[in-house]
């Protein structure tokens, strides 16, 4: 990759100076607005406090309105100030010159993170604006863009790309396909960050088309490791918030992520793009909300730490699409056996069981409990109509109590048990403990709970993002569709599944979301060409296209025994500390193995080498201080050295990755092949694998290093 020369366009330096000067003036005005709003708010509060007993109710009401207005004005001023501060650091990253058809002269547009105008003159256009799409989609020549008013055609006469940092232009280039590729490689060669960053200056054409897709109710993205699918989904949300700002806000979007560490890792992207933070939660937290006061459940178990064949079979059984069909069949038949009413008599009033049943069946789209409430209202209304003698009529809640007594099953747990018994599969349901479900039963239970009692639907959430789609079962998606009847962006990679007991595939998702648009991303950007070619051979991902960013080949480090492997691991750690990279991920196959490795590497403070057991050799307290363990209980991701399992590393990236125990015992099955692939593809710049004994067959034939 070439180093960029001095700025070849003097006019761009002049323009940047002019824009920076106007941003400085705008910042002064914004800060003055913030100070004025703060002062007005404080003065009004003081006046109300000083004259509390003297102000009449009308004046008090007016002052409260003034406080609310001042608060809104101040919040807007703070938002504008913060945006200008960010723009001063990097005002824009691109310029396009565009001449519309039948226009004699073209216009120049600078594209940045936010729009900025000074005294009604637009100086910077938001990257999400319709005209900005030409920077991502078009080369110099015939071009156009789709605006709300329709298609605008013309000619793109110039396209430039910039890197501005701390208000200083580092490079300016006439943009072309080759230059864009060079810029992308330059950006990808940087070290990793503790949080995912926006990619607005390097969005690729195929990515831009997904981001700006506003037509699809549900969009499903199948993307290989490192294809940027999570970042694309977040930028798509930012685009939709911009495009539909009148009816969609950040509080209307929910992200379902695999764990808190990943949620923290992606949490900065949306705010970086000028939007409010998005609400993020896990499948477990969602189940907690739905089942509070109903029933308890155990957390998802690590399948590698379970040695229970019956449990594995139960998990497999409930992970299939056929299981959803079986539950649907039961739900369809449920009205026939769950409610067999008798005549209802109250003093001189009477309705037959047949009439009650007809009314019950008429409300077929509603949960059983809601149907009964509606039938109770119908009975009450009928009694009121027939009440010629003006006798006392039973209230709906009295009628409902009687109708509930006619139910064959009183709660969802009884219904859930009946499902397995009636379907002849009673052995597939085992309680984890008293009134505690196994994790595999949680979403099937919720699915029946929706049919029997009803779920808490989210009317606030208007767009749901589901990441790591391959880790969730068809019944989980079926239950989610009941909870969130809204548009969805679903993303993941079926080449990176982490549960060997899940028996579902991408085609099952196509069946569940038969009207969704499916897109595939096969180009990988995260890792060097050498790392991705290495990973591609492990998992035979033929569709994967590595980015041509070259680096060192992966290192395979043979070790004499476990103690020697620990010594070699510490050598890798010392090399990392002496280098310029900022993050090293040490990725073990299981949570238990990660905990053990953490105890070995971080728990040997002050131990002399001759006092150490075979599996704990040499070290000092200074080495251990920057090592952290990432578990399901962790809440944040930080630079330094992180020890974790494959399942916890998904979605994360590290400058360097070290994979210990890459031997034939640890990575032996086809599923292990997938896990090793996931671990390898977390590395951006450097990958090292250590092993004692025989190396796993998935990496055999590669030359050893170190």
Give, region by region, the residue ranges found by the protein language model.
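Conserved helicase motor core of SF1/SF2 NTP-dependent helicases
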Residues: 246-247, 251, 260-276, 281-288, ...
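Alpha-helical nucleic-acid-binding subdomain
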Residues: 241-464, 471-479, 487, 495
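A structural signal for short, well-ordered beta-strand segments and their strand-loop junctions
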Residues: 95-97, 220, 255, 688-691
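Extended, charged low-complexity regulatory segments
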Residues: 1-200, 204, 208-212, 696, ...
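Conserved phosphate-binding and hydrolysis motifs of nucleotide-dependent enzymes
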Residues: 226-229, 467, 651
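Conserved phosphate/pyrophosphate-binding and hydrolysis machinery centered on Walker-type P-loop NTPases
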Residues: 189, 193, 317, 365, ...
């Amino acid at each position: 990759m070439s180093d960029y020369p001095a700025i070849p366009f003097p006019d761009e330096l002049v323009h940047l100076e002019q824009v920076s000067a106007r941003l400085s003036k705008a910042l002064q005005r914004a800060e003055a607005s913030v100070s004025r709003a703060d002062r007005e708010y404080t003065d009004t509060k003081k006046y109300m406090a000083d004259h509390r007993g003297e102000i009449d109710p009308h004046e008090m009401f007016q002052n409260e309105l003034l406080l609310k207005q001042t608060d809104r004005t101040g919040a807007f001023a703070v938002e504008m100030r913060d945006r200008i501060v960010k723009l001063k650091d990097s005002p824009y990253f691109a310029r396009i010159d565009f001449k519309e058809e039948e226009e004699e002269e073209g216009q120049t547009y600078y594209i940045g993170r936010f729009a900025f105008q000074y005294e009604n003159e637009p100086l910077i256009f938001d990257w999400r604006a319709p005209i900005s799409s030409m920077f991502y989609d078009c080369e110099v020549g015939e071009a156009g863009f789709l605006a709300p008013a329709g298609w605008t055609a013309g000619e793109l006469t110039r396209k430039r790309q910039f890197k501005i940092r701390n208000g200083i232009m580092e490079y300016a280039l006439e943009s072309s396909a080759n230059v864009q590729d060079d810029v992308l490689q330059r950006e990808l060669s940087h070290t990793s960050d503790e949080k995912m960053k926006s990619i607005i200056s390097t969005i690729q054409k195929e990515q831009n088309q997904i981001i700006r897709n506003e037509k699809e109710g549900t969009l499903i993205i199948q993307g290989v490791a490192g294809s940027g699918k999570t970042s694309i989904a977040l930028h798509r949300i930012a685009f939709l918030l911009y495009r539909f700002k009148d009816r969609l806000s950040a509080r209307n979007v929910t992200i379902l992520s695999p764990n808190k560490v990943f949620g923290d890792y992606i949490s900065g992207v949306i705010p970086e793009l000028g939007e409010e933070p998005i609400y993020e939660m896990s499948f477990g937290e969602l189940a907690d909300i739905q089942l509070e006061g109903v029933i308890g459940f155990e957390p998802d178990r690590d399948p590698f730490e379970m040695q229970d064949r019956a449990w594995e079979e139960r998990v497999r059984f409930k992970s299939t699409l056929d299981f959803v069909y079986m539950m649907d069949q039961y739900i369809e038949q449920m009205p026939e056996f769950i409610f067999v009413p008798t005549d209802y008599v109250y003093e001189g009033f009477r309705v037959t069981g047949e009439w009650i049943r007809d009314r019950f069946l008429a409300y077929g789209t509603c949960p059983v409990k809601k149907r009964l409430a509606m039938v109770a209202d119908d009975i009450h209304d009928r009694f009121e109509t027939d009440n010629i003698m003006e006798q006392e009529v039973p209230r709906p809640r009295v009628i409902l109590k009687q109708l509930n007594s006619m139910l064959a099953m009183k709660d969802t747990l009884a219904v859930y048990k009946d499902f397995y018994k009636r379907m002849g599969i009673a052995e597939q349901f085992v309680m984890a403990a008293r009134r505690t479900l196994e994790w595999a039963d949680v979403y099937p239970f919720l699915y029946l709970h929706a049919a029997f009692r009803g779920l808490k639907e989210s009317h606030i959430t208007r767009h749901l993002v589901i990441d790591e789609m391959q880790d969730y079962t068809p019944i989980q998606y079926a239950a989610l569709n009941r909870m969130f009847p809204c548009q969805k962006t679903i993303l993941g990679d079926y080449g990176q599944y982490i549960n060997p007991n899940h028996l579902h595939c991408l085609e099952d998702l196509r069946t569940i979301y038969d009207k969704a648009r499916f897109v595939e991303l096969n180009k990988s950007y995260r890792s060097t060409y050498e790392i991705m070619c290495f990973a591609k051979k492990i998992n035979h991902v033929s569709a994967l296209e590595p980015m041509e960013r070259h680096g060192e080949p992966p290192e395979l480090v043979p070790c004499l025994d476990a103690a020697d492997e620990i010594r070699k691991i510490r050598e890798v750690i010392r090399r990392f500390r002496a280098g310029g990279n900022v993050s090293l991920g040490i990725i073990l196959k299981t949570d238990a193995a990660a905990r053990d490795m953490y105890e070995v590497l971080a728990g040997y403070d002050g131990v002399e080498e001759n006092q150490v057991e075979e599996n704990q050799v040499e070290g000092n307290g200074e080495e251990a201080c920057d090592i952290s363990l990432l578990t399901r209980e962790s809440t944040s991701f930080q630079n330094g050295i992180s020890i974790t399992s494959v399942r916890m590393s998904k979605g994360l990236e590290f400058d360097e990755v070290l994979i210990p125990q890459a031997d034939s015992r640890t990575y032996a099955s086809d599923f292990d092949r997938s896990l090793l692939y996931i671990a390898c593809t977390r590395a951006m710049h450097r990958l090292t694998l250590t092993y004692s004994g025989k190396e796993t067959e998935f990496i055999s034939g590669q030359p050893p290093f170190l």
